[in-house]
Amino acid sequence: MEREVKFSLVFRDMWQSAGKYVPRVDQLVKVAPAIIEMGCFARVETNGGGFEQVNLLFGENPNRAVREWTKPFHEAGIQTHMLDRALNGLRMSPVPADVRKLFYKVKHAQGTDITRTFCGLNDVRNIIPSIGYAHEAGMISQCSLCITFSPIHTVEYYVNMAKQLIEAGADEICIKDMAGIGRPVSLGKIVAGIKKIKNIPIQYHSHAGPGFNMASILEVCQAGCDYIDVGMEPLSWGTGHADLISVQAMLKDAGFKVPEINMEAYMKVRSMIQEFMDDFLGLYISPKNRLMNSLLIAPGLPGGMMGSLMADLETNLESINKYKAKRNLPFMTQDELLIKLFNEVAYVWPRVGYPPLVTPFSQYVKNLAMMNVMAMEKGKERWGMIADDIWDMILGKAGRLPGKLAPEIIEKAEREGRKFFDGNPQDNYPDQLEKYRKMMLEKQWDKGQDDEELFEYAMHPAQYEAYKSGKAKEDFLADVKKRREEKANATTPVEAENKTKVLTVDVNGQPYRVTVAYGAVDPATLTAASGAVPAQAAPAPVGEGKDVLSPLEGKFFLVKNAQETPKKVGEKVNKGDVICYVEAMKTYNAIRAEYDGTITAICAN
């Protein structure tokens, strides 16, 4: 008898692997009937991950969106599932236990059937509480194994992890191959090993970027996998997922029982996805995200990071080449920097304990590698700049790292007086719901049906306040308008070559900003050349001051929160003191004094 394999449409992840936003609730409600009409999905991923936060960012209520979006699937008998980050809930930072408990109650009440829980460190201590919270709320608990490829992430490692989760009460297991770098044969062995422990439902999630995932899908199905996550045009492949049509045809040929696809409905959904992209979502999707990229195999970074990674490269390449120009050194190309970055990821990753390269730890490893490359290209030492959130990972505050830290990292932590933590990560984050209840009462805000508004405020405080004030909607509409104008005014390569340019030119050691224009130009429209680094206070006399230069470019901040006191001109500092921050690559990076002395000027460009 043919063995059945069922499909799940990862509609939420399709969008967020391609760009920043997801469709609005009116668009979701419009497309849902056609997805149902396709007749081939047992499950649909409706929310979780960044879905709720993204709704807040464009000024919409995520609670209304989840309720209205899940409703038609329930009526059709299709299960809905969401992604959650265990200790981090629906955000990038740890969440108190009382907020985590409320999370599952709210989402079940809103219509989500299954919670797919993962810990970015594969620390089962962060996942196991979610099993209990999900069951208390009436949800199916699907626990994830974050797949990566390293000497310690073996078949035995993953089968043992699954065993611990099954013994703790997991209803299902997800093989979460978020970077698509799991090797097909090994993945098949993992599935077979889990099925020997218990005949539990297994769902395979993968991304297409490196090129392994079609072979991986076939291997896991032959080993007993029950559900396959799929995407569909025009958002499949590239940084997205294998396409439904291809997967269905392959598995049918291999002898599996798979559902038929209503192609008329498929074309309706396909055309609506394109319609939503043309509306505003396409403004946030790079055409390069449709491309496969085997360069990702060696560093193991998720394909969904490539858009932000290339933007980071462009910014940091400019900084490196400014440094080289001042010293009459040969410039570096983007390809050279990319290979240096990938090589540095390979160096950094084992030394910080082999964290699985999944959100947020993939960003941490990439950022740390980029910091090292920037520092070394500018004549400084590796590990000179490690952001606080990366230190939290290294010190064990987010969970136990799979591998051992390198002696050089341990020595640096001890030199800086940092303490390692091996307790339960949840203990670091006390309950906070009462605090948010009081704040909502003071603001006269309704806690919402099933306390769903209270939950959103506690999970995403800053974004929720921006949503309530209307600022989020205002900022979003302004950004959409700006992007539409930029798209309409996009220049051709020839026009770009002849476009007015602003350059930084070094004259006797002093950088000046100059405008270069082509053809007939009205001088009144040009900004006068000026010092590229305007002083905010009188600088020290020539020859007396020493520069402290940021190794990377970004947004300048004197402090990163209200609890810190900003440094001032005239203040004495010691070598190693934090003097300011540069926000780059989604992280506040501390800039430290390189000498003992007195601040004589604060300069920012």
Placement of each model-derived feature along the sequence:
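Structured functional modules or segments
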Residues: 539-605
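N-terminal amphipathic alpha-helix/helix-capping segment at the start of soluble metabolic enzymes
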Residues: 1-18, 66-71
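Core active-site phosphate/anionic-ligand binding loop and the adjoining beta-turn-alpha structural block
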Residues: 215, 240, 248-251, 255-330
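Conserved, mostly hydrophobic/aromatic
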Residues: 14, 117, 173, 224, ...
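Terminal or standalone catalytic/regulatory effector modules within metabolic enzymes
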Residues: 36-54, 291-296, 300-532
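Active-site beta->alpha loop and helix N-cap motifs at the rims of alpha/beta catalytic domains
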Residues: 33, 48-161, 166, 173, ...
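Glycine-rich phosphate-binding active-site loops on the catalytic face of alpha/beta enzymes
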Residues: 117, 177, 223-242
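Catalytic cores of alpha/beta
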Residues: 156-162, 210-225
